[in-house]
Amino acid sequence: MDIGFMFSTPYAWLHQHVIGHHSFPNIVGKDPDLYHAPKYIRHSSDIRLKKPHFYQTMTFILTWLVGVPASLVCLGVFQAFNKPSYNKVVTFASNKHLNTDSLKLRLVLYGLVIHILPFILHGLTLRGLLFSILPIYFFSVCFMISSQINHLTPHNTEQFDKNFFKHQVITSHDVATDNYFVFLLTGGLNMQIEHHLFPSVNHCHLHKIRDHVRNTCRKHGVNYTESLTLWEALCQHVNHLRNFSKP
């Protein structure tokens, strides 16, 4: 993330993820993750229902393909220079430690490394074209799987609690926590509840505290939601999309 040109620039990521999403998960008008591509995908009731939303249970995969290159990288930089806030909900800061000084260079580096370098290495060939396109879009789908299914389900949206830690739990969703492949695929984000409660803890340690968190939630009557398989979580996400595709 200190280089930050292949995933998201640190400036945009801090506003979108750290300041916005982690502080206000699934809170309408506060969490920027509810407002990615709102013309095509509807995640909250304050987004006016439009015709493209009727088909979002089928078209969401298209937004997953471009989620990283178009939204996190390019649109994040564009908003930083041209908009007062990220996704209209997180006001951009500008100070000695948090500014846009290096954004243009990072965007150029992204274009060179991801899209131009393959042609330099392989020439104007089909191999060059495939290496220029497939890796970033494949990664984008993997990242969107890791980030969407663990918050955007019927059980976790439109939830709120004044207690900060309880709110983190009821708006997050654990996925296949006993599956090591899913852990590797998501980088540990499948233990999303634990990640939101302890965001600075390395994900390799989250499985050690998972049972303690689950038992504490049960003891105090806090809704701890989880899917036993990745497929179950994906189905839950599609159910969420279906719910918000209707008036």
List each model region and its residues.
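Alpha-helical bilayer-embedded segments of polytopic membrane proteins, i.e.
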Residues: 54-71, 95-146
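Membrane-embedded catalytic scaffold of the fatty acid hydroxylase/desaturase
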Residues: 1-97, 158-247
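C-terminal, active-site-flanking charged/polar segments
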Residues: 135-146, 152, 214-218, 223
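Short low-complexity stretches enriched in small and charged residues
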Residues: 20, 101-104, 155-156
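Membrane-interfacial segments
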Residues: 82, 125, 150-154, 158
